[in-house]
Every structure is written in C-alpha cells, then in structure tokens.
Amino acid sequence: MTHTVVIGDARRMRHVPDESVHLVVTSPPYWQLKDYGGDGQIGFNDSYGAYINNLNLAWSECRRVLHQGCRLCINIGDQFARSVYYGRYKVIPIRTEIIRFCESAGFDYMGAVIWRKVTTCNTTGGATIMGSFPFPRNGILKLDYEFILIFRKLGRPPEPDPAAKEASRMTIDEWNEYFAGHWSFPGEKQGKSRHLAVFPEELPRRLIRMFSFAGETVLDPFLGSGTTMLAARNLGRSSIGYEINRDFLPVIRRKAGADGLFDDAKVEVLEDQPLDAHAAAEAMRALPCVFRDPLPIERKTDPRERTYGSRIIRERS
C-alpha cells in the first residue's frame, strides 16, 4: 500500500489524476472558527459566500478524481454565527449548501448519518448553557451532533477482483451498525493530537469499510492530523491526503507508518503551490453553481481578535 501526503491546496489537486480514487472521506474546516495557518486556507477571515465557494472548488475536484459510481463522504456540523462577531445568534446550516452544490455538480445525494458526539470545537458559541436559562422562549439548542453526508458520483463503479471482494466482506452486525442512520461515539479528545478539529479513527474506519474494497485508494482533501490516512492504512487501503499546513506533517507521517514501525508502509510527501486569488476566482466562475448569500451577515469584529479565532496548537516533532 502507498500513502501520499501533498502539502498543497484541495481546490486544485494537480497530483491526483482523473478517476483514480475510489472513496473520498473528509471533514472540511469550519467557517470562522479556527485559524489553521498556511496560505490559501479556507474558512478563516472569509465571508460566508467565499467560504462556501472555496469548499465547492474542493468538491468539484473530488468529483474529477473519483471513479464513477464511487462515494464522497463529508463530515460537517451546523454552526452558530456568534453574537460577539455578528450581533445576533443564528444557526448556519452549512450542509444545505454542500448538498445543493454536489447535486448540481454530478453527484447523487444518498442521505446522511447523524453522528451524536461530544464536540471537539465550540460550534455552539463557547458556552455550556446557551440562551435565556432558566426562563423560556430564548433557549438555544446544543449542537452535540454532526452530519456525515453521503454522495455517489454518477456512473458504473470499477469491479473489484474476487480476492479483494472477499477480503472486504462485512459481518451482519457490522452492516446493521454501520448502515444505521444514527451513530453514537465520542469525538477525539483535543489533547491527544493537539489538533483541535481532529475526528476519531472510528469515523473514517466505518466509511472505508462501507464504501471501498481492500487495495483501493482513499482520498482526504482536508487531511489535518492524518486520521483518515491512519484508518486507510489499518484497513489495507492506499491513501492520498492534501493538507495546506506543513506543520502537521510530523504527526501525519507517524500515523501513516513512516516512522519505520510498519515495514509495508510507503509514504511519499509532495509539494504543491496554493491556488492564488486570481486563479481561485476564475475557477469559481466555471463552477456549475456559484453560491451567493441572500442575507449576508455583517461582521461586527475581526475573529482574529477573539480567542475563538485563535490559531490552532500545531503538532510538533
């Protein structure tokens, strides 16, 4: 199995050929929540419209590199627009724009898993009890769940060879648990990898078992600390990951087995340049669906001045 880490931009994955990937599993950056560092990062200090359209460039690239008939799985949660930034609370359903774009780009939406978890990021605005407690009317729901959106690229998928098919057989208990509409397991603790948005290995592990065969290739365009690559390695799949911030490379290499503990691990690290603003604007104009926010939220303050918008604590070698 081979594992390729590209220090580069998911909006233009030049190192991944057309229809060469069998599954995409990812969790994109939140909007205005954390400064992930690196030129070309998506979500921090962007307008909501720019954030959605930059994500759409990545989803368009995912469609290009996916084999026909294969799955794109996106872990995303709703977010609050915080009153400290915008003057009022409002839930932002990011998933609705992802579904709208992916359907327009040539995916079928195949439903969603609702993942109930203890969140690793303060998507509710940073408080345990929100709203008018202890009095009615203005209480605010706690966002202790996220969605795993499932899309299928149109067309006929490649046929696995008999040995890979047999090696990928699932038990009836696995099938019933994984293909249920609700999952319940905890998110990864922040202190374990010091990457604040990390998801647990169980999440990509389930999706890789559900939607790929042994020996196939899994892509994560927002690799982060490398959890999807770890799950792919442990399940006998090859993997490719794009990550804009090279500071995550030491922990990614350890998860991929480049520390020498796993003799069969072949890890390649490539470099690519981030998409510049002009090229990104041109690419957006070519999208099948360009998002325009009908009711823009006017930002009252710069998130870089608040702790909610601080830079993440990076993994150190």
Locate each region found by the language model.
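Conserved P-loop NTPase motor core of helicases/translocases
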Residues: E271-F291
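Conserved SAM/SAH-binding loop
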Residues: I7-R12, V269-A277
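Short, flexible loop/turn segments with low-complexity composition
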Residues: D161-A167, D263-Q273
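Compositionally biased amphipathic helical and low-complexity segments enriched in hydrophobic
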Residues: V24, G236, P250, F262-D263, ...
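Short, conserved SAM-binding/catalytic segment
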Residues: M1, N234, R253-E268
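Core catalytic lobe of class I
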Residues: M1-V251, M284, C289-R292, P296-S317
